[in-house]
UniProtKB/Swiss-Prot annotation:
The gene coding this protein: ADI1
Chain residues that bind Ni(2+): 88, 90, 94, 133
Cofactor: Fe(2+); Ni(2+)
Biological classification of the source: Eukaryota, Metazoa, Chordata, Craniata, Vertebrata
Subcellular location as annotated: Cytoplasm; Nucleus; Cell membrane
Name listed for the protein in its UniProt record: Acireductone dioxygenase
Amino acid sequence: MVEAWYMDESQEDQRAPHRLQPNRAVSLEQLRRLGVAYRRLDADNYETDPRLKEIREAENYSWMDIVTIHKDKLPNYEEKIKTFYEEHLHLDDEIRYILDGSGYFDVRDKDDKWIRISMEKGDMITLPAGIYHRFTLDENNYVKAMRLFVGEPVWTAYNRPADDFPARKQYMKFLAEEAQ
């Protein structure tokens, strides 16, 4: 099951949990109000899972691939890890399904504070277009994830600041409406 919390301000190893002391947990409902969607699926049977098939059809996720992030599997590993951890947004939703291993997605809340979302095998997350976020491995240094897209994949990340993009403006409008 996914777990999320507000992060401390430490610049130490990005793979560490970085929990506040005492911990400030973040609920699935709080994530939902940020536009973040979570599902728990059967990663052992992802190739034949009827629930995954239903989700892909309902959400029009017509394209997918599988990426393994590990120093022995990913070309330009160190460079990629640094790139993933740069704060950025996308113009489309980012959908990731963890098939093995674990890692962290960090997202900004409405007050611009970091929330760390711990992802492990079986977790699927959808980050809305326009949300500032980043990704890092945890201390296990390994994740295998399915990347899902509506139509052809668009890989472009826009590093912060990117507030003038329509996707960011739409996301900020969503947050304002959620606050009412």
